[in-house]
């Protein structure tokens, strides 16, 4: 790899003055810590070296020449453009709020462009669907994901010249080169922080990579489709697919990246260099860990790829706007001083005049409230509220208190009386919706409002009270989140008549609160907008002037009379002007959509208050009634004129009803908001005057917040109508929607702000939010305030056009800010509905919102699917919607979900409760029936795939390393030679001899006890019994089996003592035992082939088993799974003849083979290793010393006895050490969960061993049974060590849950620990009885993906808790090695764990002669730095060693070994290394219904399989949650999400997931998934 031009040699570095060397070293350190950039480093470094550069160049010309020979191969990351969606679709019905024929044409035109191209996307597969396709053949997704760069292209290859190879032959050159190949680091952060440093040794590794690794047979390739042929960086050879039954040997690939050589006091390098090291170490200080706060800095700048702004994006060019004033508010002499005064006036002088008419369900008038009745009943209510609810001394209500008004939408009369009654009593009404159920959508937030307003009293009608949900004993239910309320019925018969002398107190309107109107924010929180009496009055005056209201006019109100324009016009302005309101409830509109038009016709109404929805419904029902006239209407107030899509409804209504007398100038759109009240309204026009113009705006311009008349593609235009002028007496300005309230330019979209006496005054009880909304002082571009008049934010987006006309283009609440561009949710809904949806979705039942995922907002569209829509129709419609939104808005949709009809949460008036829908989506409770995720097209800010950076030069790396004061990462258990032992066992070299000796010395000493599910002893074995049983088995092997010494014998037994006897029987006969898990009788097809495979691979001459299993092996069911005719000799050992061998076999040397240990790894590889007699002896001795085992001890074992340490503990250790083993077969726990713990308690066991499966079973199964355990008298205080036997990274969370759960029954939190072993050495670590407790560290996951270790503090984001895997066993040494260069790395650096120990296996057992592989794995040497030339075995696991402050048993500082994960399990994605367990842990956390999760890769796509333990309707809820969490926490896009039934993910006896088996089943379409989602 080409390095920097001026690369001084070690000699040149040594020649530099000490202070320059020190500064250089500091600089290297800063670079490795990430404190400075590569560029800054280069600059400072060249400045430092410039005075010495001539010498440097002369001394190192050889290096220069060498560098010129090493030109790196170009590495182009091939990313194909994200695929657009191509498939023709047909579509359906629309919601007329969003209807626009122009827009529909635009959408159809946009879709037409896609017509020719086919969609390159597989349909999701759903169980019980007629459209299930095989994932393997029909569903190969396009290889176009941003996460699927071709991995070969991300790797660099270094060419090496022949001359260089020659020069590397002598040792001196090795040392110098390897020192140059080292790299900088600190104690807490490891070397590769700026990419990989590859010195010449690394290059050499490249050259020999093929001979070392690639030629050997390997497991089926799982992650790559291409592989760089000459680079060791390709972990797995490509395109080698072995048949499932193929014989596979253990093999650990060279890892792709790891930190490189770090030298210090651990391994001698060269004395000449070490003096220099000593000098530097003495002069330079050790680096410190970064301060705590640094771990919590949001590092999105480093992570996120910020999309470059489009150079052609439109920018505002106008001048800064000036606030626009409305006409002055006219002063009319007879206007009342307060609204209550107007009521008093009309109620006493015009008592017979009609005030309000209510309709029945058929739309006929049912009751008319006169002004006299309104006045008298309001008066009675006011008097009752103040005087009759409590005692005289303790009234329940005082003026200024808040009360809730709970009246249905079809009872305007009762509501009006209650509202004015409150005003007269000077209590503050808070109108809310009638709760329908205990848990209404958004009901909890209404409860929050009631609580924050301090409301204890609710007014309602008798009818409404009867309809409220009740408990069984007739009380009103306690609504979720609500305070306790007292309900008061306001029907006349319950009210007291005030005495003659009682009069309400009506003062002139001031700033005291009059009423509170609730408002739901975008997030779903409900706030109370407080309106003062003065604002209420002023607003009525402004409306009266703007609408030119006069006494006696009739107004038809179709809106909700409890809030917004329905309240202001229909309840306030009518009283102010003595008008007559006819209230048409929503329920009547549903049954008789034309009722409001009929009311206008019948009453010759002058004004109608409607929404676009009402216009649309009237048009739909128009044919039912032809003889209506709307000629009396002077104003048709369209109150949702602020919706940009209202223009088409208005146009359509006018064209239909103009023939019925509707005047074009009568249509008056207006814009309102809860905070600013009426923002603008179009005044009633003069007949014959030209109608206001339209604005045809570019959607692209709008997305950048700029007003541009649309000239480009007419498909992406938005036509908006004005909403008239500013209100009388008001002033309006437009400010930027985000940041400080800076005035916009004239061609810029912003938030409309209004200043007048007619707006709200505050959010009740929320001072902080109030200031930002109700007290806004606009500033100019320099940031200085413009005037001192406070404005109110209206929450509407728009601009002031020519002639001071106000245009609204959307709401702040509907704003979706995606990748720096603004989109309006309503616009997206309109586009979705313009895609003809025929039978797919319901109009008006679409929700659009954004969710924040990976540092940006992502658009989610949710719609209700019609029950009769087919899967195919739905999928077609969804695909077309994606195309349409992409074409028209140039934005991708992250997720499109269809839910069953009527399942979206509704608002009280029947709309969709958006925030609640979003909440359900995020918590996984939406239950979609169809879903499409498109993360590949939307997520454009992923970090660039990692590419190897040019490394820091070898010499400077060397210096930097010395600065860090690093020691080599190595650790060792106690030295076996120093341990004094006077044990008689030591004189025996073979385990069989020890058993014979014990049978003579202590014949009756019980070694084994086997328990059943009830906890009773079913079998015991004393030394003599075991010896005799073994003799008889040995005899049978000779007689029946005709076996010779050295023949392999498969032992097929359930966990028990028979298995142990058979093992020693084989040793006595000189045969080689191979323990195999028996097949599962109920699942032969899955379990028998593994047995067959081990029998074949081990070339077994005979199978020892029980009668039951023998019958099973030869059964018809077995014949369906394997060839039963070719089994070797099968001997059942149930009834043995009483015969013994004349002479027991004694192996000639301890190096002879004792037994074979076969195991299937998590990657699906079957590996057999050879264990010699000396290794067996050494293993047992190490365990005996570590656990202090001797004859009087008793241990309990609850794990599988077929391989690894589990086998050794079950079968070997008791015979060696003489302790008693209580054997608990794990499968018995399924029948009795208490078995293991009750056994430990019963026998007062101090040391117990189990597997993760057992621990998980107890944690999950006994989680809520701790009290039962206590009552049974189970106490675990006797337990000193509870050891989990594992070959993986410790599962800290499970261990902690177990400890926490059972601490209540005495389990010491210090007791639980784990072991660590691998195929090459089954027992490397085991906690044991002495030495410090296992330590834990938090490491940074991001660094781990780069093969670095960075220690962080607890709670740091992206941190991973790692626990030490027990203590290293006596006689065991480990070193951490860079798997590529085979050079040792420094303390706290990540690398492969290599082990040296007398009990290491002697090699793989294989039918091929792979001597080289054996050498590479079992007898390999460090490439440099080890004068002793120790032989090491490669474990295939990544980990690191860290020296702690604790003291080991030897008295020295303790070195902790941390296991990170198996190399061959890791996934290489986007140039980074991922451990599947980390992704799985994230996924398992997201939803309560996920039982288990496993991940693997398929054609460069990440596949996530989740087991669903809930109901099947939750299956699709998991798809977005899985996609979100993997994106957020791991920066990866999930390609396929597969939802399966519990138990589908195969797990082996050690509790490890068999991901490769799962992958094979997935590709063979054998999973029977509930749902398969292919993310686009």
From Swiss-Prot:
InterPro entries named in the record: AMP-bd_C, AMP-bd_C_sf, AMP-dep_synth/lig_dom, ANL_N_sf, Dip2-like_dom, DMAP1-bd
Localization per record: Cell projection, Dendrite; Cell projection, Axon; Perikaryon
Molecular function as annotated in GO: alpha-tubulin binding
GO annotation, cellular component aspect: axon; cytoplasm; dendrite; extracellular exosome; membrane; nucleus; perikaryon
Biased composition (Low complexity): 70-83, 155-167, 182-193, 223-234
Residue list for modification Phosphoserine: 9, 50, 53, 100, 146, 148, 153, 178, 193, 203, 259
SMART domains per record: DMAP_binding (SM01137)
Signal peptide feature range: none
Modified residue annotations for Phosphothreonine: 71, 140
Record's keyword annotation contains Phosphoprotein: yes
Polar residues bias: start-end ranges: 52-62
Assembly behavior: Interacts with alpha-tubulin.
Job description of the protein: Negatively regulates axonal outgrowth and is essential for normal synaptic transmission. Not required for regulation of axon polarity. Promotes acetylation of alpha-tubulin.
Name of the protein: Disco-interacting protein 2 homolog B
Organism the protein comes from: Homo sapiens (Human)
Lineage: Eukaryota, Metazoa, Chordata, Craniata, Vertebrata
């Amino acid at each position: 790899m080409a390095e920097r031009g001026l690369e001084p040699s070690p000699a040149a570095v040594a020649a530099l003055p000490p202070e320059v060397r020190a500064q250089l070293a500091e600089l290297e350190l800063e670079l490795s810590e990430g404190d400075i950039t590569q560029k800054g480093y280069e600059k400072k470094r060249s400045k430092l070296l410039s005075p010495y550069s001539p010498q440097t160049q002369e001394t190192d010309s050889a290096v220069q020449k060498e560098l010129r020979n090493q030109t790196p191969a170009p590495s182009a990351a091939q990313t194909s453009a994200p695929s657009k969606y191509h498939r023709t679709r047909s579509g359906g019905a629309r919601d007329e709020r969003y209807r626009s024929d122009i827009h529909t044409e635009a959408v159809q035109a946009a879709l037409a462009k896609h017509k020719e191209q086919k969609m390159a996307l597989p349909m999701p597969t759903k169980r019980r669907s007629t459209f299930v396709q095989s994932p393997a053949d029909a569903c190969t997704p396009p290889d176009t994901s941003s996460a699927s760069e071709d991995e070969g292209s991300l790797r660099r290859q270094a060419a090496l010249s022949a001359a260089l190879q020659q020069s590397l032959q002598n040792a001196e050159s090795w040392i110098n080169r390897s020192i140059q190949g080292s790299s900088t680091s600190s104690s807490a952060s490891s070397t590769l922080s700026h990419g990989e440093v590859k010195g010449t040794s690394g290059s050499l590794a490249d050259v020999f990579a093929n001979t070392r690794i690639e030629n050997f047979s390997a497991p089926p390739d799982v992650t790559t489709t291409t592989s760089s042929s000459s680079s060791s960086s390709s972990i797995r050879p490509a395109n080698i697919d072995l048949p499932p039954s193929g014989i596979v040997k253990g093999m650990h690939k060279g890892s792709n990246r790891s930190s490189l050589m770090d030298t210090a006091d651990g391994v001698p390098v060269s004395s000449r260099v070490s003096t220099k090291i000593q000098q530097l170490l003495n002069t330079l200080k050790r680096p410190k860990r970064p301060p705590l706060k640094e771990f919590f800095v949001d590092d999105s700048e480093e992570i996120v790829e910020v999309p470059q702004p489009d150079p052609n994006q439109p920018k505002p060019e106008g001048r800064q706007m000036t606030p626009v004033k409305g006409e002055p508010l006219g002063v009319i002499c007879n206007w009342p001083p307060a609204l209550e005064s107007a009521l008093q006036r009309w109620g006493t002088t015009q008592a017979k005049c009609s005030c309000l008419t209510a309709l029945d369900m058929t739309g006929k008038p049912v009751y008319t409230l006169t002004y006299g009745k309104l006045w008298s009943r309001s008066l009675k209510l006011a008097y009752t509220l103040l005087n009759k609810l409590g005692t005289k001394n303790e009234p329940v209500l005082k003026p200024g208190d808040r009360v809730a008004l709970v009246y249905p939408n079809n009872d305007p009369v009762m509501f009006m009386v209650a509202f004015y009654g409150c005003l007269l009593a000077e209590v503050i009404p808070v109108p809310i919706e009638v709760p329908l159920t205990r848990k209404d959508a958004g009901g909890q937030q209404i409860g929050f409002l009631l609580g924050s307003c301090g409301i204890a009293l609710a007014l309602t009608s008798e009818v409404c009270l009867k309809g409220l949900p009740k408990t069984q004993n007739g009380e009103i239910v306690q609504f979720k989140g609500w305070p306790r309320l007292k309900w008061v019925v306001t029907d006349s018969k319950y009210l007291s008549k005030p005495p003659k002398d009682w009069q309400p107190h009506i003062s002139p309107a001031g700033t005291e609160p009059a009423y509170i109107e609730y408002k739901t924010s975008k997030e779903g929180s409900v706030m109370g907008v407080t309106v003062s009496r003065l604002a209420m009055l002023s607003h009525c005056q402004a409306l009266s002037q703007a609408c030119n209201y006069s006494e006696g006019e009739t107004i038809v109100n179709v809106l909700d009379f409890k809030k917004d324009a329905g309240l202001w016009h229909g309840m306030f302005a009518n009283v102010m002007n003595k008008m007559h309101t006819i209230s048409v409830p929503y329920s009547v509109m549903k049954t008789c959509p034309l009722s409001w038009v009929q009311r206008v016709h019948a009453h010759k109404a002058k004004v109608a208050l409607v929404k676009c929805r009402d216009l649309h419904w009237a048009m739909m029902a128009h044919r039912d009634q032809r003889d209506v006239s709307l000629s009396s209407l002077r104003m048709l107030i369209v109150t949702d004129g602020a919706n940009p899509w209202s223009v088409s409804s208005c146009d359509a209504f006018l064209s239909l009803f103009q023939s019925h007398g509707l005047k074009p100038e009568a249509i008056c759109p207006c814009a309102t908001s809860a905070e600013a009240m009426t923002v603008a309204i179009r005044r009633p026009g003069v007949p014959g005057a030209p109608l206001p113009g339209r604005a045809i705006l570019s959607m692209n311009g709008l997305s950048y917040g700029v007003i541009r008349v649309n000239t480009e593609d007419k498909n992406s235009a938005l036509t908006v109508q004005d909403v008239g002028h500013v209100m009388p007496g008001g002033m309006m300005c437009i400010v930027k929607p985000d940041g400080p309230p800076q005035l916009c330019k004239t061609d810029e979209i912003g938030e409309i702000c209004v200043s007048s006496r007619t707006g709200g005054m505050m959010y009740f009880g929320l001072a902080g939010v109030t200031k930002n909304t109700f007290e806004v002082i606009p500033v100019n571009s320099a940031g200085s305030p413009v005037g001192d008049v406070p404005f109110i934010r209206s929450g509407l987006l728009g601009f002031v056009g020519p002639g001071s006309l106000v245009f609204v283009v959307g709401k702040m609440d509907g704003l979706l800010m995606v990748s720096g561009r603004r989109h309006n949710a309503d616009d997206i809904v309109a586009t979705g509905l313009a895609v003809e949806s025929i039978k797919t979705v319901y109009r008006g039942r679409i929700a659009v919102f954004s969710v924040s995922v990976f540092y940006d907002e992502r658009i989610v569209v949710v719609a209700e699917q019609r029950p009769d829509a087919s899967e195919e129709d739905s999928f077609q419609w969804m695909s077309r919607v994606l195309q349409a939104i992409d074409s028209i808005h140039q934005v991708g949709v992250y997720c499109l979900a269809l839910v069953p009809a009527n399942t979206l949460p509704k608002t009280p008036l029947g709309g969709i409760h958006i925030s609640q829908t979003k909440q359900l989506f995020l918590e996984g409770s939406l239950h979609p029936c169809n879903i499409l995720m498109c993360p590949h097209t939307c997520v454009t800010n992923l970090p660039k795939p990692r590419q190897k950076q040019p490394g820091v030069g070898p010499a400077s790396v060397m210096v930097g390393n010395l600065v860090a004061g690093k020691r080599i990462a190595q650790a060792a258990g106690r030295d076996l030679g120093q341990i004094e032992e006077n044990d008689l066992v030591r004189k025996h070299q073979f385990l069989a001899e020890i058993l014979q000796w014990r049978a003579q010395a202590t014949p009756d000493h019980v070694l084994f006890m086997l328990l059943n599910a009830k906890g009773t002893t079913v079998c015991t074995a004393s030394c003599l019994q075991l010896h005799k049983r073994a003799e008889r088995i040995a005899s049978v092997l000779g007689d029946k089996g005709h076996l010779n010494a050295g023949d392999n014998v498969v032992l097929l037994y359930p966990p028990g003592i028979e298995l142990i006897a058979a093992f020693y029987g084989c040793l006595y006969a000189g045969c080689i035992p191979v323990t195999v898990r028996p097949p599962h009788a109920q699942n032969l097809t899955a379990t028998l082939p593994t047995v067959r495979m081990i029998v074949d691979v081990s070339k077994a001459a005979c199978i020892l088993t029980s009668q039951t299993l023998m019958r099973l092996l030869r059964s018809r069911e077995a014949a369906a799974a394997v060839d039963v005719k070719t089994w070797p000799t099968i001997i059942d050992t149930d009834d043995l003849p009483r015969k013994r061998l004349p002479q027991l076999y004694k192996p000639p040397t301890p190096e002879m083979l004792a037994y074979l240990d076969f195991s299937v790894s998590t990657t699906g590889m079957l590996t057999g290793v050879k264990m010699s007699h000396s290794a067996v002896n050494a293993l047992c001795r190490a365990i005996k010393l570590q656990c202090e085992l001797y004859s009087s001890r008793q241990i309990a074992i609850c794990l599988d006895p077929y391989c690894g340490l589990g086998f050794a503990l079950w079968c070997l250790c008791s015979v060696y050490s003489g302790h008693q083993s209580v054997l608990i077969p794990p499968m018995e726990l399924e029948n009795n969960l208490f078995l293991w713990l009750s056994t430990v308690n019963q026998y007062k066991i101090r040391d117990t061993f189990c597997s993760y499966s057992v621990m998980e079973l107890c944690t999950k199964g006994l989680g809520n049974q701790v009290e039962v355990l206590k009552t049974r008298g189970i106490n675990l205080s006797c337990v000193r060590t509870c050891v989990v036997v594992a070959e993986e990274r410790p599962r800290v969370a499970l261990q902690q849950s177990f400890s926490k759960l059972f601490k209540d029954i005495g389990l010491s939190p210090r007791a639980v620990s784990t072991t660590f072993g691998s195929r090459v050495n089954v027992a490397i670590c085991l906690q044991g009885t002495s030495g410090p407790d296992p330590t834990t560290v938090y490491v940074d996951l991001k660094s781990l993906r780069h093969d670095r270790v960075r220690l962080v503090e607890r709670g740091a984001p992206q941190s991973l808790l790692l626990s030490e895997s027990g203590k290293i066993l006596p006689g065991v040494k480990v070193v951490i090695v860079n798997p590529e260069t085979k050079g040792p790395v420094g303390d706290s650096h990540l690398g492969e764990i290599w082990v040296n120990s007398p009990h290491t296996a002697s090699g793989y057992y294989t039918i091929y002669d792979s001597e080289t592989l054996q050498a590479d794995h079992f007898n390999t040497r460090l490439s440099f730095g080890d004068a002793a030339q120790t032989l090491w075995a490669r474990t295939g696991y990544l980990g690191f060693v860290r020296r702690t402050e604790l003291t080991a048993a030897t008295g020295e500082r303790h070195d902790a070994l941390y296991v990170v994960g198996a190399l061959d399990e890791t996934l290489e994605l986007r140039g980074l290394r991922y451990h599947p367990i980390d992704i799985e842990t994230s996924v398992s956390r997201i939803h309560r219904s996920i039982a288990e999760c496993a991940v693997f890769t398929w054609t460069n796509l990440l596949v996530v399989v989740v087991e669903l333990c809930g109901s099947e309707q939750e299956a699709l809820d998991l798809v977005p949650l899985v996609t979100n969490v993997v994106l957020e926490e791991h920066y990866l896009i999930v390609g396929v999400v597969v939802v399966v039934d519990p138990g589908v993910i195969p797990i082996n006896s050690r509790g490890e997931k068999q991901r490769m088996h799962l992958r094979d089943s997935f590709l063979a379409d054998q999973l029977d998934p509930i749902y398969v989602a292919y993310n686009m």
